[in-house]
């Protein structure tokens, strides 16, 4: 996974990624607010009332999340093709048009594709793409992926977030867990490959980075 994160930003020709990803996330208006472009809006979990008019500041961004969303949807399509091909394979075997070893190979590929899809989706759904904090610093908005590879916003109270200084996480690791006292959600962010855009607001939520690096 770390190799994939290093490779994504080095891919030549950003236009090659931009074309299939233009319907993912794009900037709307001024500032760092991100809106969904497409036929439907992304679902939000437990969206507090009044957030439509509240101003949010971007404090963290992981640019490779767009490529991972595209990869997730590509993997979903590939898995669907392999699974759909199984019934015709069984029919061909029953008619003597396919050997048992070929059918077993096809079934193995489909099973492996399903396992990989479940693993990738489980991780990608918890990988943070963008973090926002409202003006008063009381509400955290987490932009991450759904099972289908589309964007989803989850709202968390800042008071419910466990600071990294109180957790056993090492900020030097590739992925760092961010958890809630209530245990509702667990997300992962990468301080190594992501960018902290507002250190002051980030520190108000997760603790001062200088202190964290010295304590780990």
Curated annotation (Swiss-Prot):
Topological domains annotated Mitochondrial intermembrane? 92-103
Which organism does this record belong to? Rattus norvegicus (Rat)
Keyword list, A-Z: Membrane, Mitochondrion, Mitochondrion inner membrane, Transmembrane, Transmembrane helix
Q: What is the lineage of its organism?
A: Eukaryota, Metazoa, Chordata, Craniata, Vertebrata
GO biological process: one example = mitochondrial respiratory chain complex I assembly
| Positions of transmembrane segments | 69-91, 104-124
Q: Which family does it belong to?
A: Belongs to the TMEM186 family.
Instruction: List the Mitochondrial matrix topological domains.
Output: 1-68, 125-216
Q: How does it assemble?
A: Part of the mitochondrial complex I assembly/MCIA complex that comprises at least the core subunits TMEM126B, NDUFAF1, ECSIT and ACAD9 and complement subunits such as COA1 and TMEM186. Interacts with MT-ND3.
What's one GO-annotated cellular component? mitochondrial inner membrane
Q: What does this protein do?
A: As part of the MCIA complex, required for efficient assembly of the mitochondrial complex I.
* Topological type in the membrane: Multi-pass membrane protein
The record's InterPro entries line, in alphabetical order, gives: Tmem186
Question: What is this protein identified as?
Answer: Transmembrane protein 186
- ATP-binding keyword on record: no
Q: Where in the cell is it found?
A: Mitochondrion inner membrane
């Amino acid at each position: 996974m770390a190799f994939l994160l290093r490779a994504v930003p080095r891919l030549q020709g950003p236009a090659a990624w931009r074309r299939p990803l233009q319907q993912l996330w794009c900037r709307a208006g001024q500032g760092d607010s991100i809106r969904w472009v497409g036929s439907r809006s992304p679902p939000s979990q437990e969206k507090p009332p009044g957030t439509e008019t509240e101003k949010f500041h971007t404090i963290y961004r992981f640019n490779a999340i767009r490529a991972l969303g595209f990869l997730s949807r590509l993997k979903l399509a590939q898995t669907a093709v392999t699974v759909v091909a199984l019934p015709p394979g069984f029919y061909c075997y029953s008619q003597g048009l396919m050997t048992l070893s070929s059918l077993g190979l096809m079934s193995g590929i489909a099973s492996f594709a399903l396992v990989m899809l479940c693993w990738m989706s489980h991780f990608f759904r918890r990988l943070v793409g963008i973090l926002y904090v409202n003006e008063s610093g009381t509400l955290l908005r987490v932009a991450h992926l759904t099972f289908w590879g589309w964007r989803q916003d989850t709202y968390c109270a800042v008071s419910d977030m466990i600071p990294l200084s109180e957790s056993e996480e090492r900020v030097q690791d590739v992925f760092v867990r961010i958890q809630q006292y209530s245990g509702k959600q667990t997300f992962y962010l990468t301080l190594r490959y992501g960018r902290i855009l507002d250190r002051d607001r980030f520190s108000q939520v997760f603790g001062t980075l200088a202190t964290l690096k010295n304590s780990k």
